[in-house]
Amino acid sequence: MVKLKKSLFLVLFLGLVSLSICEEEKREEENEEVQEDDDQSEEKRGFLDIVKHVGKAAGKAALNAVTEMVNQGEQ
């Protein structure tokens, strides 16, 4: 009976350790995926900021060109 209890405790302990290790690896993988998603969204935001600034600069340049043409036409 004592051998059976020891064997049962050993099996339960090893199973618990194995489960704990699997859960830890799963959490690490999820954290890596979240971090990769964050990095990708930061890259997208950076790209969109650049496009926005280029668009503003192009719009200002076009507005200045039109304004100059109108001013030259009035003279």
Swiss-Prot record:
Q: Where is this protein found?
A: Secreted
Record region (Disordered): 25-44
Instruction: Provide this UniProt record's keywords sorted from A to Z.
Output: Amidation, Amphibian defense peptide, Antibiotic, Antimicrobial, Cleavage on pair of basic residues, Fungicide, Secreted, Signal
Q: What is its main location?
A: secreted
Q: Which stretch is the leader sequence?
A: 1-22
Sites bearing Glutamine amide, chain numbering: 72
One Gene Ontology cellular component annotation?
A: extracellular region
Which InterPro entries does its entry note? Dermaseptin_dom (IPR022731), Frog_antimicrobial_propeptide (IPR004275), FSAP (IPR016322)
Tissue pattern of expression reads:
Expressed by the skin glands.
Query: Which positions are listed as propeptide?
Result: 23-43, 74-75
One of the protein's GO biological processes: defense response to fungus
Q: Which domain of life is it from?
A: Eukaryota
Name of one Pfam family that matches: DD_K
Q: List compositional bias (Acidic residues) regions by residue number.
A: 30-41
* Family (UniProt): Belongs to the frog skin active peptide (FSAP) family. Cruzioseptin subfamily.
Function text: Has antimicrobial activity.
- Recorded protein name is Cruzioseptin-11
